[in-house]
């Protein structure tokens, strides 16, 4: 018997800090939106990482959130590849169109990964760092594993009629459910004499 893990099943939900009780299991898989940097542009890798960390902390309400590292990496990747037209494969269980990323203006970077539902409204987050203001406007794609039971998943996916839209089925079909080998250990109980 072969054991393997496939990519997690994903759905579209609001940013994780707007949820309660499940923050410890959140994983950001992808995002769709635009990063705008006004003022001092990041030129070195250190500056790009610092800007990305500041933006991720502003979105997640601090740097202790479980999604902080993955979101920082996502933003830093966009700032790194944004200076020229690049094609980046954001990762998929089947061949997916590569994502073009470009600077529309010297201070603006856009990125559009895998299909995201247009009915989920984009949100805007702004943070000020030394000599610059960074703004992200867009949507997030998270792992469904942190949403909990199916009831919660349906409730969250049902925002703006998403559960009844063709996009919901498309997203469900597009991403595979993660297969996990679960080992359960029972606490030994004392048998009666």
Curated annotation (Swiss-Prot):
Give the residue range of the signal peptide. none
Q: Which Pfam families match?
A: Rhabdo_matrix
Record-linked InterPro entries: Rhabdo_matrix
Alphabetical UniProt keywords: Apoptosis, Host membrane, Membrane, Viral envelope protein, Viral matrix protein, Virion
Q: How does it sit in the membrane?
A: Peripheral membrane protein
* GO terms of molecular function: structural constituent of virion
Report the subcellular localization: Virion membrane; Host endomembrane system
Q: Give the main localization category.
A: virion
On the tree of life, the source organism's domain of life is Viruses
Single GO cellular component annotation?
virion membrane
| Other noteworthy facts | Most abundant protein in the virion.
Family under the similarity heading: Belongs to the novirhabdovirus matrix protein family.
Its quaternary structure?
Homomultimer. Interacts with nucleoprotein and with the cytoplasmic domain of glycoprotein.
**Protein role:** Plays a major role in assembly and budding of virion. Completely covers the ribonucleoprotein coil and keep it in condensed bullet-shaped form. Inhibits viral transcription and stimulates replication.
Q: What is this protein called?
A: Matrix protein
Q: Which gene encodes it?
A: M
């Amino acid at each position: 018997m072969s054991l393997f893990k496939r990519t997690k099943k994903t759905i579209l939900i609001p940013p994780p800090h707007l949820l309660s009780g499940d923050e410890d299991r959140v994983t950001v898989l992808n995002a769709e939106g635009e990063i705008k940097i006004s003022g001092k542009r990041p030129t070195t890798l250190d500056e790009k990482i610092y800007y990305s960390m500041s933006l991720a902390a502003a979105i997640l309400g601090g740097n202790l959130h479980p999604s902080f590292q993955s979101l920082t990496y996502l933003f830093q990747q966009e700032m790194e590849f944004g200076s020229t037209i690049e094609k980046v494969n954001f990762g998929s269980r089947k061949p997916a169109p590569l994502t073009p990323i470009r600077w529309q203006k010297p201070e603006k970077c856009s990125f559009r990964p895998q299909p995201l539902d247009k009915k989920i409204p984009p949100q805007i987050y702004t943070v000020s760092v030394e000599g610059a203001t960074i703004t992200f406007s867009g949507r997030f794609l998270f792992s469904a594993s942190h949403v909990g039971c199916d009831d919660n998943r349906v409730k969250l996916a049902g925002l703006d009629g998403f559960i009844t839209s063709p996009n919901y089925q498309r997203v469900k079909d597009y991403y595979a459910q993660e297969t996990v080998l679960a080992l359960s250990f029972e606490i030994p109980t004392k048998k009666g004499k």
